[in-house]
């Protein structure tokens, strides 16, 4: 998707910071995991930062939706109801239908309406991108007939992988509430998301998958044609 990814990532207990920068545009901003007194809470929260510059900083004219603001939208019981629905979806994937790993998700609007359910179909569809969060996001966008989900919250049974987290940014979600951590999914399912985060921190030449650019001028010509389109839709 991108010929160059310049990123910085730190993986520590209780905190993950990931930045992906391509062609000077922020793809994924700063992410903080909130923990109380170093104890694992019943639900953890990922605030999604909208916008940013090439250094990963949030510009002054962009609003950050905080954990407190999102969690204050509904009573604790409603948040737990949405999370239990996401967990039930994870059971469909990993135990009942056996379509993939035990990952499930739901998308909830600002008004508290569930507009999409999703669960992992990687094995059933032979599709490495068919994660529970991706399934839910695709269905929500299809329902709303737009590629953005501002005002919505993603509830997911497990802490999102780098792909799903990046997609949450592209979709413009207000926040993510998750159940199990990446450490849990690694311990019980052998899903090593931390390896991918660590790869982003490595220089391009040291990564497990090589990257190089080719025929850039020809590729840029198409971008110029796209830029000249009067009817293009920015997203």
Residue spans for each PLM region:
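Short, flexible loop/turn motifs enriched in small residues
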Residues: 96-102
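A short, polar/charged loop-to-alpha-helix boundary motif
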Residues: 122-135
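Immediate flanking context of iron-sulfur cluster ligation sites
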Residues: 146-158
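Short beta-strand scaffold segments in enzyme catalytic cores
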Residues: 103-109
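Zinc-dependent deaminase
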Residues: 3-96, 167-235
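Conserved redox-active cysteine motifs that mediate thiol-disulfide chemistry
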Residues: 158-166, 170
């Amino acid at each position: 998707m991108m010929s160059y990814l310049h990123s910085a990532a730190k993986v520590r207990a209780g905190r993950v910071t990931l930045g992906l920068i391509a062609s000077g545009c922020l793809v994924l901003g700063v992410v903080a995991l909130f923990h109380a007194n170093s104890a694992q809470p019943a639900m953890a929260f990922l605030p999604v930062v909208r916008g940013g510059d090439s250094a990963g900083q949030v510009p002054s004219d962009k609003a950050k939706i905080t954990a407190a603001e999102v969690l204050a939208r509904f009573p604790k019981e409603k948040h737990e109801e949405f999370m239990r629905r996401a967990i039930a979806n994870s059971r469909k994937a990993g135990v009942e239908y056996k379509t993939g790993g035990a990952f499930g998700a739901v998308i909830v609007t600002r008004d508290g309406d569930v507009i999409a359910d999703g669960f992992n179909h990687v094995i059933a569809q032979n599709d490495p991108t068919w994660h529970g969060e991706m399934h839910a996001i695709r269905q929500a966008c299809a329902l709303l007939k737009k590629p953005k989900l501002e005002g919505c919250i993603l509830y997911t049974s497990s802490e999102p992988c780098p792909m799903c987290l990046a997609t949450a940014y592209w979709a413009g979600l207000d926040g993510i509430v998750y159940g199990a951590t990446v450490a849990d999914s690694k311990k019980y399912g052998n899903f090593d998301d931390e390896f991918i985060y660590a790869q982003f921190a490595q220089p391009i030449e040291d990564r497990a998958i090589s990257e190089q650019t080719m025929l850039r001028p020809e590729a840029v010509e198409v971008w110029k044609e796209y830029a000249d389109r009067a009817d293009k839709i920015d997203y």
